[in-house]
């Protein structure tokens, strides 16, 4: 818990402190009046003929004390002390205890019930006279009213129950625990850790708060907020100083038996422990003989006298440990010695003990060596090679003067069952029954119960005051107005004084984090919808965000888009779901270990839980080989997972050609996007009027008639490490990605590019201009943050899935805590899809168009024939200077293979140059140019 370092109070807290100070003085005044009470004084219930007042507190004090005695009887003796004690307690808290009308009413109700119960018990248990009742008027009235119905026993039980109930409501703890703490205070003992936690969890003065699992917008709008106010009502000036804490709910009795974990007390050398502080007093610890364990190679100290006699060490040896067996500490049968600081026999005989131990060690080593030699001779006599190897493999006791022993380190391979391949290297072939459900179930993901980490209002208030105090030290005047607690971070929203710029706070973020003793903080200069700035600080206990929890949320279930992807939760704990179709492309960057690959897997699994293979197809490029190769074999793939970067460029080139083909279809059907195209296909299929392919030409396929058009599926291209792809074919890949990013949105091709090196040579300006949606995980510097987000902030993230998301068309950054899933969960989902069907790979995606054209052209070149369109293409190329194969394909309405073959013929005839960086040059000129 963060310690309070600021004594800055609000005006309301100063007013309350003043009231409590007045209550203390009034309590002292009543104690003086109680100590000098005399029944002869003129008071509330009696009159005297004596004109003077005997009571030291005067007539007013005598009147109050007599009133207490008449109303409450003997119970009135404790009321002055209660008034003083309660006022002193709250005054010592110095405004740490939040007040509210409900809490004040609860305390008054509990105290009233407690007084009623105690007065009833005093009336029943003690003697009463016609002039004085032991329980006062209150106790006598209650006994008289309920005695006919409950009798003596019933009134005793009822009075006891009322007293206990009132005590619990008023104090927030049980009477037994209070007695234990009172006894510990008398005996100067500190309460145990468990008792302290239980007190904290059940005391209404220090109400504990827990994070909500899934807070919704409706719940926040309905008033699910806890105001840290100290009075039933507040004026306009007081409301300005209130701190609103969102996403917190009050809990009581959070402690349970599951939180009590067994703890092991580590062995600590006695010479390192000089004094132990108990209850604020320094007490010398009792010396005890620690157990000597041979599980340690180092010698263990016998007592605290080792500081004076460093040469005195116990005899220890190392016992061979077999893998898989529990390590048991073995102790030799030695007489127990009770040591104390007054005993000096050990120090006097240290030399003798050391000689005895060395002799014992040499004797033990000699016997062990002799035993091993005898066993080796017997093994050789019996020609038992396995026994000999076992003996040689046993660890030997290393003495100070042992010779080097040369052991064979060559592994001995043995057959593993029916195979010579190690089980770890064998490919697991699992035969899984085809699931009956249309989509995978969320039961494939592990259900991890959310852990509600407690956080107190006191900690929130103290941290808020520390932030205000440290900002004041840096010359910034600000007031915390709102606090939003999330699963990973807490955002403190501050109102700056007029004339203070938000950039001034951003410039001191590092110094402010150091002053607040946080690992890092992030300053949000703009909070949409609020006139505040935000300071986001990490929580002490971080809550894990699971993928199942996000996929099972209403936000993800009610999303209508096929390409909805779950990212995680925002700082308020609400699930974050994005639509890839609206992005329409995504750029992901983050340093190594920041959670980038887990974030990409989260997006892929979100789609696999939502779409069918005929709706969405994947092209996965994995330079790391191990990140996306687990998805190899799912029916959503258009081709196998690409691990060769040279083939990856071919896959992107195929996407460009597919984009051009789809645009021709959209133009022929007079629609603007893939949604309109699929709707028109469904409309005519419902009327049994399939639409023939309008761009089909004889020779493109083996069909004699144009085939019917089918619905187009979305294509998601995922590149796990974009930097490796840029290193192999940078310029060519940049142009291909730029073309896809510019035009592929309407025809359903979307890109997800991830890299761990967000530098300008990888994320070029051409790529950034066409990919507006970005996600930044933890990066190394502010320069990298500006490269990916055009803003700073990603360098201050906490890692492990903590990210900043910038959507298309908005410069606002949303902090998201990424969802987590294990490798086993990913494997279960992949196996489920593999059991549903096999992938239908498209041949030629990874093949270079130039290679195919060369092979096809080889046969025609041998025959000495040129294409029929060769002369027309030559005229077109020399006049326009265009050397694009896809452009020739569209211009002359030929297939891709034929267009590539013509382009190769142009190269052989010397009309165009060879391919260089994805381009060709026109070498020939028209005759009119001469």
UniProtKB/Swiss-Prot annotation:
GO terms of molecular function:
ATP binding; DNA binding
Record's keyword annotation contains 4Fe-4S:
no
Q: Which SUPFAM superfamilies match?
A: P-loop containing nucleoside triphosphate hydrolases (SSF52540), Winged helix' DNA-binding domain (SSF46785)
Q: Where in the cell is it found?
A: Cell inner membrane
Transmembrane region positions?
14-34, 68-88, 106-126, 128-148, 149-169
Q: Which residues lie on this side of the membrane: Cytoplasmic?
A: 170-930
Instruction: From the UniProt record, give one GO term of the biological process aspect.
Output: cell division
Outline the extent of the FtsK domain.
Answer: 573-786
Main location per the UniProt record: membrane
Q: Which domain of life is it from?
A: Bacteria
Q: Which UniProt keywords apply?
A: ATP-binding, Cell cycle, Cell division, Cell inner membrane, Cell membrane, Chromosome partition, DNA-binding, Membrane, Nucleotide-binding, Transmembrane, Transmembrane helix
The UniProt comment on domains reads:
Consists of an N-terminal domain, which is sufficient for the localization to the septal ring and is required for cell division, followed by a linker domain, and a C-terminal domain, which forms the translocation motor involved in chromosome segregation. The C-terminal domain can be further subdivided into alpha, beta and gamma subdomains. The alpha and beta subdomains multimerise to produce a hexameric ring, contain the nucleotide binding motif and form the DNA pump.
Report the function annotation for this chain.
Essential cell division protein that coordinates cell division and chromosome segregation. The N-terminus is involved in assembly of the cell-division machinery. The C-terminus functions as a DNA motor that moves dsDNA in an ATP-dependent manner towards the dif recombination site, which is located within the replication terminus region. Translocation stops specifically at Xer-dif sites, where FtsK interacts with the Xer recombinase, allowing activation of chromosome unlinking by recombination. FtsK orienting polar sequences (KOPS) guide the direction of DNA translocation.
How this chain assembles, per its entry, is: Homohexamer. Forms a ring that surrounds DNA.
Q: What is this protein called?
A: DNA translocase FtsK
């Amino acid at each position: 818990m963060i310690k309070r370092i600021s004594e800055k109070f609000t005006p309301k807290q100063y007013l309350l402190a003043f009231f409590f100070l007045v209550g203390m003085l009034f309590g002292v005044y009543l104690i003086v009046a109680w100590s000098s009470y005399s029944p002869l004084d003129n008071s509330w219930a009696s009159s005297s003929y004596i004109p003077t007042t005997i009571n030291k507190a005067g007539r007013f004090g005598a009147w109050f004390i007599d009133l207490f005695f008449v109303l409450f009887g003997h119970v009135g003796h404790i009321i002055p002390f209660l008034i003083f004690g309660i006022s002193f307690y709250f005054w010592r808290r110095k405004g740490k205890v939040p007040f509210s009308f409900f809490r004040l009413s609860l305390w008054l109700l509990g105290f009233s019930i407690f007084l009623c119960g105690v007065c009833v018990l005093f009336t029943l248990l003690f003697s009463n006279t016609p002039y004085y009742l032991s329980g006062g008027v209150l106790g006598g009235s209650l006994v008289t009213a309920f005695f006919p119905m409950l009798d003596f026993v019933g009134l005793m039980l009822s009075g006891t129950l009322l007293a206990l109930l009132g005590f619990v409501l008023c104090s927030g703890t049980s009477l037994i625990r209070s007695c234990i703490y009172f006894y510990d205070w008398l005996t100067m003992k500190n309460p145990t850790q468990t008792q302290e936690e239980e007190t904290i969890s059940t005391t209404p003065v220090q109400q504990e708060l827990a994070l909500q699992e899934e807070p919704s917008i409706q719940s926040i709008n309905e008033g699910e907020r806890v105001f840290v106010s100290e009075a039933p009502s507040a004026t306009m000036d007081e409301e300005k100083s209130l701190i609103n804490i969102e996403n917190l709910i009050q809990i009581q009795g959070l402690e349970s038996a599951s939180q009590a974990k067994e703890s092991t007390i580590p062995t600590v050398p006695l010479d390192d422990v000089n004094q132990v502080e108990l209850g604020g007093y320094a007490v010398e610890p009792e010396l005890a003989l620690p157990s000597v364990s041979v599980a340690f190679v180092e010698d263990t100290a016998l007592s605290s006298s080792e500081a004076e006699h460093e040469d005195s060490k116990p005899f220890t040896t190392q016992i061979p440990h077999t893998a898989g067996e529990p390590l048991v500490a073995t102790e030799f049968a030695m007489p127990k010695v009770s040591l104390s600081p007054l005993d000096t026999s050990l120090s006097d005989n240290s030399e003798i003990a050391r000689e005895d131990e060395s002799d014992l060690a040499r004797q033990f080593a000699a016997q062990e060596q002799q035993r091993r030699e005898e066993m080796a001779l017997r093994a050789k006599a019996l020609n038992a090679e396995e026994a000999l190897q076992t003996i040689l493999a046993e660890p030997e006791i290393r003495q100070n003067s042992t010779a080097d022993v040369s052991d064979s380190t060559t592994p001995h391979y043995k057959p593993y069952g029916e195979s010579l391949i190690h089980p770890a290297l064998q490919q697991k072939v699992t035969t899984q029954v085809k699931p009956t459900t249309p989509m995978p179930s969320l039961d494939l993901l592990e259900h991890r119960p959310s852990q509600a980490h407690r956080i107190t209002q006191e900690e929130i208030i103290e941290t808020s005051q520390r932030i205000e105090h440290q900002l004041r030290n840096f010359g910034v005047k600000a007031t915390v107005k709102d606090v939003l607690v999330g699963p990973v971070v807490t955002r403190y929203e501050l109102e700056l004084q007029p004339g203070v710029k938000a950039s001034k706070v951003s410039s001191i973020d590092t110094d402010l984090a150091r002053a607040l003793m946080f690992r890092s903080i992030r300053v949000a200069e703009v909070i949409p919808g609020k006139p505040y700035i935000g300071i986001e600080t990490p929580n002490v206990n971080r809550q894990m965000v699971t993928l199942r929890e996000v996929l099972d949320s209403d936000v993800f279930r009610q999303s209508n888009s096929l390409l909805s992807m779950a990212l995680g939760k925002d700082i308020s704990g609400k699930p974050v779901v994005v639509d890839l179709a609206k992005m329409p492309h995504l750029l992901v960057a983050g340093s190594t270990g920041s959670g980038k690959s887990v974030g990409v897997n989260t997006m892929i699994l979100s789609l696999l839980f939502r779409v069918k293979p005929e709706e969405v197809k994947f092209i996965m490029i994995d330079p790391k080989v191990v990140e996306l190769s687990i998805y190899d074999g799912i029916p959503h793939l258009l081709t196998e997972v690409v691990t060769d970067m040279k083939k990856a460029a071919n896959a992107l080139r195929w996407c460009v050609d597919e984009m051009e083909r789809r645009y021709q279809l959209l133009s022929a059907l007079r629609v603007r996007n893939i949604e309109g195209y699929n709707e028109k296909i469904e409309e005519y299929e419902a009327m049994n009027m399939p639409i023939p392919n309008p761009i089909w030409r004889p020779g493109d396929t083996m069909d004699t008639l144009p085939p019917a058009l089918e619905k187009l599926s979305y294509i998601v291209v995922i590149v796990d490490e974009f930097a490796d792809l840029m290193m192999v074919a940078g310029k060519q890949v940049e142009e291909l990605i730029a073309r896809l990013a510019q035009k592929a949105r309407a025809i359903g091709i979307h890109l997800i590019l991830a890299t761990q090196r967000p530098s300008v040579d990888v994320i070029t300006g051409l790529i950034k201009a066409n990919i507006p949606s970005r996600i930044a995980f933890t990066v190394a510097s502010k320069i990298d943050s500006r490269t990916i987000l055009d803003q700073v902030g990603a360098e201050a993230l906490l890692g492990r899935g903590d990210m900043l998301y910038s959507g298309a068309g908005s410069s606002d950054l949303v902090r998201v805590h990424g969802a987590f899933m294990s490798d086993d969960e990913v494997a279960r989902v992949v196996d489920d899809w593999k059991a549903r069907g096999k992938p239908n790979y498209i041949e030629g995606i990874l093949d270079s168009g130039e290679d195919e054209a060369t092979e096809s052209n080889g046969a025609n070149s041998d025959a000495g024939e040129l294409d029929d369109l060769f002369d027309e293409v030559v005229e077109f190329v020399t006049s326009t200077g265009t050397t694009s194969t896809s452009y020739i394909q569209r211009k002359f309405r030929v297939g891709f293979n034929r267009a590539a073959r013509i382009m190769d013929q142009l190269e052989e005839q010397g009309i165009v140059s060879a391919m260089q960086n994805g381009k060709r040059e026109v070498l020939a000129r028209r005759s009119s140019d001469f």
